[in-house]
C-alpha cells in the first residue's frame, strides 16, 4: 500500500539469515510492529488506542520470546534496527527531494534547448564516436543500418537534424515527467520481459509461489498484466480488465484506469485469466489483485511490509511489432527490469534494442537465464551471455553475481506450488495449506529471490532512485557534450566567417567601382547617341526646303495654275515628311548599333551575371503618329505669292540670258541639231512642242513673247523716227514716241511676271513654310520627339546594365549581411551554450553527489 500503516505479524520462525540458533532464541521478537509510510517512521504503542500492550516491542514496550512470553525487556538489536530504518527512510526521502529538484532543473535545461533549437538549429554530431550521446542520440535507421554504426555514415542536412532533435527533446521531456512521477510514487514496479516463449509468466508464478498466470509451450500472454496485492482493492481478489474501447493504447489505459471508477474497467475472476491474457484485440491492460498473505513478510514479495510492489508480465518482444513498441515504451514507467533470456537463443536483436533503450536510465537490470540445464557447454553459454550483457549494461556485468542468474529449472512445472486457480471456490482456502511445504531446494532460484528482495527492499534507494539518477546523469552529460560541440563548431564558424568577410570587402569595393565605370560609360554613349539624333533631325528639317528649283513640280501653264499651286504645296510638305523620315531612319540605325554594343559590353564586363533575354527590333520605333503639331503646318495663300519680281530677274529676262528653269534632256524625236539650236535660241527647250501647241500660255516661259514685243515695238519706234525724224527734239515727237515705248514696256513687264511665275510661287511658298516652322518651333519639337524616342529605347539596355550591376552588388551585400547576421547569431549561440554548459556542469555535480548506496 502506498499510504497508511502496515503490520508485520509474528512468523513463529527464526529469521532465515540467522546463523546462530542461540542468538535467535535470545532475540525478542515483537508480536506486532506498525510502520507508517506517510510519517516515514514506526508508530508508538499507543497508536489507535493501544496502551500497555505487552505483546508489542517498540519504544521500550514488551514483546515475547519465540518459545514463550517473557517480561518486558529492552532489545538493543531491535532499537538499532529501528534507528537504522528511520535513517534509511530519512536518507531515501532526502535523495528523493534532491532528485526531484534535479529533474525540474533538467527540464528547464531541455526547455532552453528546445527554444534555442527552434531559433537556431542545434548541431548534433551523429557520426562522431568520440562524442557519442547516451540519451539524446539520434539513431537514424536507413536500409536496416544505423548511421552511428557506419564508418561512412550518411549525412543529413542541419535543419532536418534539428527537427529530429526536436522530437527527441519532446521524448526526453515526457520521460522526465515519467521519472518525476516514479520518484514521487513510493511503490515499486517490477517489469518482467524478454523474448517470446522464454518463460516470463512461469517466472512470475515462481516469484508468487502460485500458478496464477497461464503457462503454455506456445506464447499465451498477449496483454500486459500487472499483479498487485489485494489490500489495494479492499482485500478482494479479482481482475480489472481495461478494454480497448475505453483506452485504445496502453498509455491511455494506465492514465484512465481508476480503481474508484468501475466504468474504466471490467471485473473478472482469477479463473478467467487463461481466457483474458491472450485477448490483446480486446483488452489493453489487466490489473490482477491477489492475496499474498499466506507467507511471512520475510519471504512474501507483494506483502513485504516495507514497500508496495507490483509485478508486470509483458508480451514477448519479438512476437508483434506493435506489442514490442509498447514494451519499449513501458520501460519508462517501471523501476526494475527482470529480463528473461532463453539460454538456447541468448540475447536476440529485439532484446538488445530493448536493453540499450532501458540502460539509458537503468544501470542495473536483472537477467534470468532459463533452460540453462539444457545447455551442454554451460561455461561457454555463460561467457557468451555475459559478454553480451557487458556490451549492453556494463554496471550489471560488474555485479553479475547479484544481477545475472542462470536458472536450471525452466519454471514451467511447479509441482511444489499450490495452484490457487484449481479450487472451485477461490476464496475457500484451508488455513493449514502450506504452498511450499514439499518444495525441494533450488539454490539458483533461491539466490535470484534473495538478490531481488535485497535489491528492492533493503537497497530501496538504488532500486527506486538509481534509474532517475542514472538517466539524469547521462542526460546532463549529453547536454554538456552538445554544448561543447556547438561552442566548438560556432567558434570554428566564426573564424571562417571572419576570413570570408575579409575576402569579401575588397570584392565589394572592386565590384562597386567596376559597376560605376560601366554605368557611366553606357550613360555617356547613350547621351551621345541621343544628342546625335537630335542634331541630325534638326539639321534635316532646316535643310528640308533648300531644294533646287528644277526639283519642284513642273509649271503647266496659266490654265493649270491651281494644280501647280497645290502640287507645289504638297511637294514642300512631302519634303518636310521625308526629312523627318530620314532622321527617324538615322535614329533607328544609331540606336540599333548602340543597343548591340551595350549588350556586348554587358556580357563582356559582367559575364553570366548579365542576363538579358530581350530582342531589340528597331522597326518598332516611331510607330506612333507624327507629332500632333504637324496638323497645324498649313500656310495661307494670296495672289501675291504668284509673283516675286526682281530687277535682276527682269533685266535677265530682257537680255535673254540663262533661262528661268534648267534645260531638260533632249525631247524624243528632236534630233536635228539645227532644229535643237533654234528651239534653244527661242527658249522652247523646257516643254515638248506639242504642249506649246495645246497650252499656248506656256509660250510665256519662252523668248517668243519678248521677241514679238521687241519686233512690234521697234517697228513702231523706227516708223515714228522715219516719219518724224527731223522733229525729234520737239515735245510732240517725244510724246508720240513714248506711247509705244510704254506699251511695249508694260507688255514686257507683264510677260516677265508670267514668265517668272514657275520660280516665284515655289520660292514664296518655301519662305512661308520656313516661317511657319519657326513660328511653331516645329524643328525643335520633332528633334526632341526623335531624341526622346531614342532615349526611351536606350533606357532599357542601360537599365539592364544598371540592374545587373545592382544584382551583383546586392548578391555581395546580401552575402555580407548573411555572414554578419550569422556571426551575430553564432555569438548569441556561443553565449547561450556557455551559460548552458556552466549550469549543466554544476547540476551534474549535484546529481553525482547524491549518495544512494547508504540505506
UniProtKB/Swiss-Prot annotation:
One of its GO terms (molecular function) is GTP binding. Keywords: Coiled coil, GTP-binding, Hydrolase, Isopeptide bond, Membrane, Mitochondrion, Mitochondrion outer membrane, Nucleotide-binding, Transmembrane, Transmembrane helix, Ubl conjugation. Changing residue 538 to P: Abolishes fusion function. It is found in: Mitochondrion outer membrane. GTP binds at residues 197-202, 370-373, 408. There is a cross-link at residues 398, 464 (Glycyl lysine isopeptide (Lys-Gly) (interchain with G-Cter in ubiquitin)). It is an enzyme of class 3 (hydrolase). Changing residue 523 to H: Abolishes respiratory growth. Restores respiratory growth. PROSITE patterns: G_DYNAMIN_2. Residues 1-19, 413-433 have a biased composition (Basic and acidic residues). Residues 727-736 are mitochondrial intermembrane. Homodimer. Dimerization depends on GTP binding. Component of a large multiprotein complex of 800 kDa. Binds the cytoplasmic domain of UGO1 which binds MGM1 through its intermembrane space domain. Interacts with MDM30. Interacts with UBP2 and UBP12. Interacts (when ubiquitinated) with DOA1; the interaction recruits FZO1 to CDC48 and promotes FZO1 proteasomal degradation. Essential transmembrane GTPase, which mediates mitochondrial fusion. Fusion proceeds through several steps; first mitochondria are tethered together, then brought into close contact, followed by the formation of a docking ring around contact areas, and finally membrane fusion. Fusion of mitochondria occurs in many cell types and constitutes an important step in mitochondrial morphology, which is balanced between fusion and fission, mediated by FZO1 and DNM1, respectively. Functions antagonistically with DNM1. Present with 1000 molecules/cell in log phase SD medium. This is Mitofusin FZO1. It comes from Saccharomyces cerevisiae (strain ATCC 204508 / S288c). The gene is FZO1.
